[in-house]
């Protein structure tokens, strides 16, 4: 009996654990500290800084099953998903890694043993082929002489991409940096499937399938293209779980493995589909994996960046459900079956199941409102199409108005053998982005480009000032040896008390100084293992190697500490008041305010906000000790420590405890006792995305300031109402009731005046071919009264056409009324459109009643004068 996908995953990890590898949990799908990546798309992403020498681990061998997403950006497989055997938006990458430990010999031997040993995967050796880089004789000889693969099944692949080292079998992280040859292992499904071995003209067939890529990082590529040997070569491997599962389960398509068969059956059940071969089932089965895990990792549907990619995938799935005949929201119902089929890899998802389901349901409901209208518009455009390409402007309009991602439009078009002008769509999108950039005023961030080879030691938990040495200087992202007064720069020290922004806590401010210089620090950021002090040299000069005294702004740090500690108390209080589904989705802690985003599906009630405030202030009054302990990550989680969203943790972590009330992993700076916080007040609660709420709060002196401000406002209101704070509510109710009564009386007077005005106007109507035409500009009449006047006049005049206008604050308001017996010849919407166009506006409505607005009041007399001629022509 073949292994299940879950068993294959576990067997891989168990095998490498038996070979001395540390089993490392999958990292988040949101890459940590890597702005070059939209999503985690390979197993090595979480070890990138280790390979670059910027990070160190307490192990030299690791193995993972890494969750990955490829949709959007460079790795955009979305349009192929569901239509081919092996394209996915979400997949798991099995990998083993050596950080300067073993190299080619062991890497190849490990792979061969796992794949062919009867104890493990037991694949037939004669079905396995390998490729090596053309000049990698070492790997070739290991495969031939040590493993024993015949020469005819070892294929050398050269530079097949038009440049030196540009090859399927040569891997590089970028234009410079670690790189090296790789060897790939292929499985031969047999001659009953079309295709040829790698490197042959038929290599794109499905007979020979790549199952494992083993990268040998042995060079450091220089800017001039030369390859310098790395002092400690490393290994990075990747094997797609879905691919190896297909091989081990003896199926040719990833969608036929047990995991997908189960999901496809679940999709059929919730949509009512009966044909299990329908490709829409495969699309939805794939998409629920990426969508659910992205939401669990903190991504929310939106119109930009990662959130937009998520929205595109959700909407593509919903549209395919629509094609299958789904009559109600269905997508969120697949989260439970997904958790079941993922086994141990679904534990993180299970903890957030309710939140993930709610986000998916809300997003589907919102899109369902526009899906039908958008599809109808697309059908209209395709019906008018004379060629075989839909223009980019139309595709953009569908996106902009109805929320149709271009790949969803392309899906519909592909079903009718129509292409989409994606270049035209991108041009329209880029124009929108350009306008957005100009509106935002943001420029380039040179600091984000900085790469620092050195490391800084943070000593700010115990020191607010200390002496350090400058190890690097950067100006506009470029390394320099010295800076002079007036220059803005990033200064890196060997040790520093300055806290670099992390975990939602902002970076410290302060001063770096010496006998002859002063550098004002406005922010502190991390660059790999280095800490950069961002600011401006106020006086003197500063060079690499100089000694400095680093002094943080102590008062500011103290306020930040209070706010950060209060954030932990509030997180725990929210979980007690609202439920344990609450988890952090983002935070900001500075010296003025704390901002906390958390999972919750509805606005907090006033009594819930008060309960959270009361609970936090109760812990402040308890004056609990705030204690820090360093322990292993797994031990911390076993203790119940909550991990913060978006943070990357080492194997050894700081566990912050506040008595028996709160325990979290945190690297930030904190008060000594909860009593130091003084007072906690929530100043706002709002929504930021589907299923995500945001609280802003203040502490200490900031909280006292808000109390005084509230008191001052109440005193001012009491003074204005000639009362005092004790009976203020009664006074306000009395004033509001009196105001409502006066407004009602005023409205009655306006209606009486309008009726009188209507009676006066009726005598001004003229006869045009048997129809009474009344055109008039009114003064002192509110725009909203025009409709009432038109109704009155239609009752008085019988067969009639009426156009009334008024000007208020420079804006023109227009209304046209046409009695029903005349609408076959004159339509109010066309009439009002003709007038509105002349006054710089537009409008519309029914054939018997239409309204419009305009901005050119000076053109109104001429516009009204044109009505008689236009109507006469229509009535002839």
Swiss-Prot record:
Check the record and name the SUPFAM superfamilies matching this protein. Answer: Class II aaRS and biotin synthetases, Putative anticodon-binding domain of alanyl-tRNA synthetase (AlaRS), ThrRS/AlaRS common domain, Translation proteins
In the record, N6-acetyllysine modifications are located at: 74
Copy out the cofactor comment. Binds 1 zinc ion per subunit.
The record lists the catalysed reaction(s) as: tRNA(Ala) + L-alanine + ATP = L-alanyl-tRNA(Ala) + AMP + diphosphate
Entry-linked PROSITE patterns? AA_TRNA_LIGASE_II_ALA
Among Pfam families, the record links this protein to: DHHA1, tRNA-synt_2c, tRNA_SAD
Cite the binding residues for Zn(2+).
Answer: 564, 568, 666, 670
* A cellular component term, taken from the record's GO annotations: cytosol
Show the CDD domains listed in the entry. Answer: AlaRS_core
Any idea which UniProt keywords this protein has?
Acetylation, Aminoacyl-tRNA synthetase, ATP-binding, Cytoplasm, Ligase, Metal-binding, Nucleotide-binding, Protein biosynthesis, RNA-binding, tRNA-binding, Zinc
User: Where, subcellularly, is it found?
Assistant: Cytoplasm
Q: Per its record, what are the GO molecular function terms?
A: alanine-tRNA ligase activity; aminoacyl-tRNA deacylase activity; ATP binding; tRNA binding; zinc ion binding
> What does the UniProt record say this protein does?
Catalyzes the attachment of alanine to tRNA(Ala) in a two-step reaction: alanine is first activated by ATP to form Ala-AMP and then transferred to the acceptor end of tRNA(Ala). Also edits incorrectly charged Ser-tRNA(Ala) and Gly-tRNA(Ala) via its editing domain.
Domains (record comment): Consists of three domains; the N-terminal catalytic domain, the editing domain and the C-terminal C-Ala domain. The editing domain removes incorrectly charged amino acids, while the C-Ala domain, along with tRNA(Ala), serves as a bridge to cooperatively bring together the editing and aminoacylation centers thus stimulating deacylation of misacylated tRNAs.
Question: Which family is this protein grouped under?
Answer: Belongs to the class-II aminoacyl-tRNA synthetase family.
NCBIfam families annotated for this entry?
A: alaS (TIGR00344)
Descriptive protein name: Alanine--tRNA ligase
Which organism's genome codes for this protein? Shigella flexneri
Q: State the taxonomy lineage.
A: Bacteria, Pseudomonadati, Pseudomonadota, Gammaproteobacteria, Enterobacterales
């Amino acid at each position: 009996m073949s292994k299940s996908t879950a068993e294959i995953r576990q067997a891989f990890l168990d095998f490498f654990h038996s070979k001395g590898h540390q089993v490392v949990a999958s990292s988040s799908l949101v890459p940590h500290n890597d702005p070059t990546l939209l999503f985690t798309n390979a197993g090595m992403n979480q070890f990138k800084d280790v390979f670059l020498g910027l990070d160190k681990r307490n192990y030299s061998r690791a193995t993972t099953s890494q969750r990955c997403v490829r949709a959007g950006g460079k790795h955009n497989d979305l349009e192929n998903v569901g239509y081919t055997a092996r394209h996915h938006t979400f997949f798991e990458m099995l990998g083993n890694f050596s950080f300067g430990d073993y190299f080619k010999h062991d890497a190849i031997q490990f792979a061969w043993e796992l794949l062919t040993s009867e104890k493990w995967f037991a694949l037939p050796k004669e079905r396995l082929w390998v490729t090596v880089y053309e000049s990698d004789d070492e790997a070739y000889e290991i495969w031939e002489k040590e493993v024993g693969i015949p020469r005819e099944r070892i294929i050398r692949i050269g530079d097949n991409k038009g440049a030196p080292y540009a090859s399927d079998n040569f891997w590089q992280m970028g234009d410079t940096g670690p790189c090296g040859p790789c060897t790939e292992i292929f499985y031969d499904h047999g001659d009953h499937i079309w295709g040829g071995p790698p490197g042959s003209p038929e290599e794109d067939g499905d007979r020979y399938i790549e199952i494992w890529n083993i990268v040998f990082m042995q060079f450091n590529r220089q800017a001039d293209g030369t390859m310098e040997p790395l002092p400690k070569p490393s290994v990075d491997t990747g094997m797609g779980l879905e691919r190896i599962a297909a091989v081990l389960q003896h199926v040719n398509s990833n969608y036929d493995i047990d995991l997908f068969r189960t999901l496809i059956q679940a999709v059929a059940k919730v949509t009512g589909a009966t044909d299990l071969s329908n490709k829409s089932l495969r699309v939805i089965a794939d998409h629920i994996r990426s969508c659910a895990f992205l939401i669990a990792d903190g991504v929310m549907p939106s119109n930009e960046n990662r959130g937009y990619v998520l929205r595109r995938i959700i909407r593509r799935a919903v549209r395919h459900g629509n094609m299958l005949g789904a009559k109600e929201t269905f997508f969120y119902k697949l989260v439970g079956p997904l958790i079941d089929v993922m086994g141990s890899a679904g534990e993180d998802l299970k903890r957030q199941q309710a939140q993930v389901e709610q986000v998916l349901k809300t997003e589907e409901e919102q899109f369902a409102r526009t899906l039908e209208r958008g599809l109808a518009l697309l059908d209209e455009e395709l019906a008018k199409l004379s060629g075989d390409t839909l223009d980019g402007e139309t595709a953009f309009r569908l996106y902009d108005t109805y929320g149709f991602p271009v790949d969803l439009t392309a899906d519909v078009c592909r079903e009718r053998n129509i292409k989409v002008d994606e270049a035209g769509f991108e041009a329209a999108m880029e124009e929108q982005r350009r306008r957005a950039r100009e509106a935002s005023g943001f420029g380039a961030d040179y600091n984000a480009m900085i790469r620092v080879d050195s490391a800084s030691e943070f000593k700010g938990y115990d020191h607010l000032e200390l002496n350090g040495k400058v190890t690097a200087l950067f100006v506009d992202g470029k390394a320099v040896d010295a800076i002079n007064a007036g220059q803005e720069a990033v200064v890196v020290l060997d040790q520093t008390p300055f806290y670099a922004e992390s975990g939602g806590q902002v970076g410290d401010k302060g001063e770096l100084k010496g006998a002859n210089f002063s550098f004002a620090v406005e922010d502190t950021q991390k660059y790999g293992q280095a800490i950069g002090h961002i600011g401006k040299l106020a006086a003197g000069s500063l060079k690499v190697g100089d000694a400095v005294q680093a002094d943080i702004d102590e008062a500011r740090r103290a306020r930040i500490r209070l706010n950060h500690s209060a954030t932990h108390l509030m997180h725990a209080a929210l979980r007690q008041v609202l439920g344990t589904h609450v988890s952090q989705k983002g935070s900001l802690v500075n010296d003025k305010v704390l901002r906390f985003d958390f999972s919750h599906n509805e606005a907090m009630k006033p009594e819930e906000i008060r309960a959270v405030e009361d609970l936090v202030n109760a812990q402040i009054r308890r004056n609990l000790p705030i204690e820090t302990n360093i322990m292993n990550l797994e031990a911390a989680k076993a203790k119940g420590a909550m991990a913060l969203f978006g943070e990357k943790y080492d194997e050894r972590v700081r566990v912050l405890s506040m008595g028996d009330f709160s325990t979290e992993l945190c690297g930030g700076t904190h008060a000594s006792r909860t009593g130091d916080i003084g007072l906690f007040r929530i100043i706002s609660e709002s929504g930021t995305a589907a299923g995500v709420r945001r609280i802003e709060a203040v502490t200490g002196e900031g909280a006292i300031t808000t109390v005084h401000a509230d008191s001052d406002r109440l005193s001012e209101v009491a003074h204005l109402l000639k009362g005092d704070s004790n009976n203020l509510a009664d006074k306000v109710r009395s004033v509001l009731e009196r105001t409502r009564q006066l407004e009602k009386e005023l409205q009655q007077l306006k209606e009486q005046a309008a009726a009188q005005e209507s009676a006066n106007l009726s005598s001004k109507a003229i006869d045009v071919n048997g129809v009474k035409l009344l055109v008039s500009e009114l003064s002192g009449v509110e725009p909203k009264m025009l409709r009432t006047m038109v109704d009155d006049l239609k009752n008085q005049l019988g067969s009639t056409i009426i156009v009334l206008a008024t000007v208020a604050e420079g804006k023109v308001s227009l209304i046209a009324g046409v009695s029903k017996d005349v609408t076959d010849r004159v339509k109010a919407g066309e009439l009002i459109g003709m007038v509105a166009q002349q006054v710089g506006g537009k409008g519309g409505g029914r054939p018997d009643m239409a309204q419009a607005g305009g901005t050119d009041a000076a053109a109104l007399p001429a516009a009204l004068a044109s009505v008689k001629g236009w109507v006469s022509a229509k009535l002839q």
